Amino acid sequence: MTPTDAKRPLQLNDQGQLRHFLSLDGLPRELLTEILDTADSFLEVGARAVKKVPLLRGKTVCNVFFENSTRTRTTFELAAKRLSADVITLNVSTSSTSKGETLTDTLRNLEAMAADMFVVRHADSGAAHFIAEHVSPDVAVINGGDGRHAHPTQGMLDMLTIRRHKGSFDNLSVAIVGDILHSRVARSNMLALRTLGCPDIRVIAPKTLLPEGIEQYGVRVFTDMNEGLRDVDVVIMLRLQRERMQGGLLPSEGEFYKLYGLTTQRLALARPDAIVMHPGPINRGVEIESAVADGPQSVILNQVTYGIAIRMAVLSMAMSGQTAQRQIDSESVSEEQQ
């Protein structure tokens, strides 16, 4: 596991604007801040009677979800519709991929429908990067989660949640707790927090759920929950990803909750104004107590609201970056012909 797994040139156009959104690795602090600022401006749209702006009118956004996720798919659909885009959601279970069609063939057929942007979720790490390398240069690709690798929009909505509740990342202590090994959210959060200047990033997990080389992310590692939670400002809980586990990693869910579950008593070890986050879906009584998930320090539902704004920001910025690159390429061709 290394924190250097994305090719920056593929994600950005020649002017340094967002073109694809595949990973937070390699993206500069200024760009992450621009995404947060843009999302902040879109939060107001959600409070309007008519929740629409015309930024993507005439554009088609295609959600290609090879992995189920009600929350991510729905918020991407809402984000695109609030930007006035036409939205197609591919039901992969009934698509030609289940009949043996390759991923590239599926995307070529979608391109023939004149889609301008793909939002891709896939069980294989690197799938979004592969797609971005093989689609038409006019199409933007957004990673909605790929294997264990990355979930960049979740990472950014978590950063927006933290910034709106804590003001900035300076002097913050943030703890990420649970199944770090299988979590693409953990990877994206660690990269984002480091880039945005968070000075104290902690990961708390049993040794069997910690990936090798995690120290390269500039984090402090704790296997004792009580020690790791002491005086933190933010607690990000992660679910146990049983579907990605092979036997022997955990004795039982009950044992995990006993050692790493976030209870009211454990939360008291954090700062009194600490916030509690979770990317969902929540496993109550496994990684978090209901009293904490529904309590006054929980901002879990805020994360869902902020997720729409972040995805609006990413969709609009990537489309703008693609348009700018087409203009750059067109001008280059004109100069060569003169």
From Swiss-Prot:
L-aspartate binds at K99, R184, R239. Its EC number is 2.1.3.2. Heterododecamer (2C3:3R2) of six catalytic PyrB chains organized as two trimers (C3), and six regulatory PyrI chains organized as three dimers (R2). Pfam families: OTCace, OTCace_N. Pathway: Pyrimidine metabolism; UMP biosynthesis via de novo pathway; (S)-dihydroorotate from bicarbonate: step 2/3. Keywords: Pyrimidine biosynthesis, Transferase. GO terms for cellular component: cytosol. Gene3D superfamilies: Aspartate/ornithine carbamoyltransferase. The keyword Transferase applies. PANTHER family: ASPARTATE CARBAMOYLTRANSFERASE, ORNITHINE CARBAMOYLTRANSFERASE, MITOCHONDRIAL. Coiled coil: none annotated. The gene is pyrB. Belongs to the aspartate/ornithine carbamoyltransferase superfamily. ATCase family. It catalyses: carbamoyl phosphate + L-aspartate = N-carbamoyl-L-aspartate + phosphate + H(+). InterPro entries: Asp/Orn_carbamoyltranf_P-bd, Asp/Orn_carbamoylTrfase, Asp/Orn_carbamoylTrfase_sf, Asp_carbamoyltransf, Asp_carbamoyltransf_Asp/Orn-bd. The lineage of its organism: Bacteria, Pseudomonadati, Pseudomonadota, Gammaproteobacteria, Pseudomonadales. This is Aspartate carbamoyltransferase catalytic subunit. Carbamoyl phosphate binds at R71, T72, R121, H151, Q154, G280, P281.
